[in-house]
């Protein structure tokens, strides 16, 4: 479980960012912007949850083959799930504010790019 903790911590940080961004959009631009932003964040966050589940199911040297297979399956599933969620959002949600959707989507992805740089960093003097 300790090796899985950073992934789940990152997912929690992403979820908090999604919720704060959606609430901020709701307050400043109205309900359409708010739920559009929430959809964009969920389109990024849910596939990341799927990937984390698939990627960290196995551990240990004996499961090396399963780990690699699981990573590839997780990434493929993440891409497919992202495409399906975008299609569902644009086909099924009217009205939709695309800039809010894409903005929070990108913000959520940026959290996953930047958070590993800050997580677990210890500053010690030489």
UniProtKB/Swiss-Prot annotation:
Gene Ontology CC entries for this record: plasma membrane; proton-transporting ATP synthase complex
GO biological process: proton transmembrane transport
InterPro entries per UniProt: ATP_synth_I
Pfam families from the UniProt entry: ATP-synt_I
Chain segments annotated as transmembrane: 10-30, 32-52, 71-93, 98-120
Keywords: Cell inner membrane, Cell membrane, CF(0), Hydrogen ion transport, Ion transport, Membrane, Transmembrane, Transmembrane helix, Transport
Location within or outside the cell: Cell inner membrane
Coiled-coil ranges per UniProt: none
Bilayer topology: Multi-pass membrane protein
Job of this protein: A possible function for this protein is to guide the assembly of the membrane sector of the ATPase enzyme complex.
Family designation: Belongs to the bacterial AtpI family.
NCBIfam families associated with the record: PRK05760.1 (NF004414)
This protein's name: ATP synthase protein I
Organism: Pseudomonas aeruginosa (strain ATCC 15692 / DSM 22644 / CIP 104116 / JCM 14847 / LMG 12228 / 1C / PRS 101 / PAO1)
